[in-house]
From Swiss-Prot:
Superkingdom of origin organism: Bacteria
Record HAMAP family: Ribosomal_bL34
Gene Ontology molecular functions: structural constituent of ribosome
Taxonomy of the source species: Bacteria, Pseudomonadati, Spirochaetota, Spirochaetia, Spirochaetales
GO cellular component: ribonucleoprotein complex; ribosome
Name of the molecule in the record: Large ribosomal subunit protein bL34
Amino acid sequence: MKRTYQPSRVKRNRKFGFRARMKTKGGRLILARRRAKGRMKLTVSDEKKKY
């Protein structure tokens, strides 16, 4: 049986990246909450790895 997690950096960034979060009102609220909490990394795109 195939495992459910098949990592892809492109898909991950498209779904959970900074620009994806900025697109929707809800995503911007997530960023605001994470900023208020003082998170070092706001989104997965902040992990800054090469492709």
